[in-house]
């Protein structure tokens, strides 16, 4: 944890070597990045090992990287995979740290003001702080992030100014250290030593860094000199050895030097005067009173405490930006030569473009009715054109790239169509709509007899429900996956499908990325000739691809005519299948079924209670730590259980029962990891 940049190389751990289309994809991607190409696309089919390809590119070029995923679930999967590939390097996780978030809003029609309400998850906050620290300190850093990365973060210049640099032999007064820690928003707690706190015992100061999970630093002073710096386990007190120097980072990204706060207050006062004059001129006296009262209260809080509720709304002044300038984000912490990888780019890119507009609409109402100053509009996510300017060299990764990625990449579309397993894209059949229900019933029975699974996608909720009832009445074990089901329950349903609890899964939009089930040998697309979002070329290719992990994969499209989208999807699937077949023949490869155990593919996002249930269904009961048998169902229950275990752990530590405390710490690690993936 030196102040100098750590230049350790990436070391990739894997039992496999690149095969299929992976070697040429790795070579081409790396070559383009070395040549300075700004945009390229990895067009990788389902099951072709796109993440492994990207990991090889990062290791080969030895450059820091950010992986953007469209949601927390996929971000967690990528994080777990990258951690497995690079156990010796810094693989970090950066997603929204809110368990619950209700932004402030005003509804003019009913004159209703909704206060901001939020619950911050300490574990995710620690991981976010660790991510920015790794970017600032280490070259061997991979940060897996959600679209949260384009939202405003503390100004990196202020953040770096506030750091406390400690060095053995340095002359520094104990009071200076304590005052600096208070500036960094650390709190003194001599009883409960927790993340973001420090304690003092004579001339020894112990600090538990905000970004650390299991290491604290001890400062041993001799008069006004730092005699020794060492790292230790904050729970057991066991030492990890001395270090020559250590840097303490602020407890939050939003920490601001006192001088900057005082400057900001003066600018806020000037804007308040201007806004009051505007409201009086427009005869909006209620709004004038409202903005005066709220802003003056915030100013007083900032003056006395250094922060206020909703301080992010004054971020323009706190970061010293001009009106309309982009807010500082995670991109400002990235090294200039970092690589950006946008996973499932056909979903992620449109998300990035849509964030700004929704946020702007809500804030304009708050400004218009006197709840916020106009400068609050600059507390926002990046606009798409700002994101484009800030983004470093970019690789778009998708099985179905969007028009934007294809246009940006030009001719640099790298195909990764051949799978290492030799599996082919599914065969496609077109059958008439008039027989779709009865034909599907017959196909489902055939697949169930072979212990294979079926995915069925319909156009409407009612049709999905009716079809589920019909199949159920005719003896088919069937479940219906709908939009009200949360992520954890969704993973449990998929797990039950894989385990053979039922044979057919019906849904409206089953193309969601990550729904890869090797046991599925048939995908049935009802009313495939109805043009629209759910039957577009991209949606059809994604849905057909759900059967691509099975040796007997087939897709049946029920249609009375062939639409342009169907034609393009069929042509593309056949192109891939021909290329895969030719490669297999040339290299003597026999397609192999994907025989991964259920646990291997679905450990992420699954609670321990589901694990126990699955083991029981297989006639076994695994011994899990006691605390995890009744796994929490939601974020609130997780927090309660974590706090309860922490209290027990600290109690054992105070009573010097370190073995018991360490056992509970292991349970906490498991529970926190499970929480990250479940949420």
Swiss-Prot record:
GO biological process terms, semicolon-separated: nucleotide-excision repair, DNA damage recognition; SOS response
GO molecular function: ATP binding; ATP hydrolysis activity; DNA binding; excinuclease ABC activity
Residues annotated for ATP binding in this entry: 44-51
Keyword DNA damage tagged: yes
CDD domains (UniProt xref): DEXHc_UvrB, SF2_C_UvrB
Gene3D superfamilies in UniProt: P-loop containing nucleotide triphosphate hydrolases, UVR domain
Annotated UVR domain residues: 639-674
GO cellular component: cytoplasm; excinuclease repair complex
Residues of the Helicase ATP-binding domain: 31-414
Pfam hit, one: Helicase_C
Keyword Nucleotide-binding: yes
Chain ranges for the short sequence motif Beta-hairpin as given in the UniProt record: 97-120
Signal peptide: none
InterPro entries (UniProt xref): Helicase/UvrB_N, Helicase_ATP-bd, Helicase_C-like, P-loop_NTPase, UVR_dom, UVR_dom_sf, UvrB, UvrB_inter
SUPFAM superfamilies cross-referenced by the UniProt entry: C-terminal UvrC-binding domain of UvrB, P-loop containing nucleoside triphosphate hydrolases
Keywords: ATP-binding, Cytoplasm, DNA damage, DNA excision, DNA repair, Excision nuclease, Nucleotide-binding, SOS response
Domain (Helicase C-terminal): residue spans on this chain: 436-589
Cell location: Cytoplasm
Main location: cytoplasm
UniProt remark on domains: The beta-hairpin motif is involved in DNA binding.
PANTHER family: UVRABC SYSTEM PROTEIN B
Function: The UvrABC repair system catalyzes the recognition and processing of DNA lesions. A damage recognition complex composed of 2 UvrA and 2 UvrB subunits scans DNA for abnormalities. Upon binding of the UvrA(2)B(2) complex to a putative damaged site, the DNA wraps around one UvrB monomer. DNA wrap is dependent on ATP binding by UvrB and probably causes local melting of the DNA helix, facilitating insertion of UvrB beta-hairpin between the DNA strands. Then UvrB probes one DNA strand for the presence of a lesion.
Subunit composition and interactions: Forms a heterotetramer with UvrA during the search for lesions. Interacts with UvrC in an incision complex.
Family note: Belongs to the UvrB family.
Name the UniProt record assigns to this protein: UvrABC system protein B
Organism name: Haemophilus influenzae (strain ATCC 51907 / DSM 11121 / KW20 / Rd)
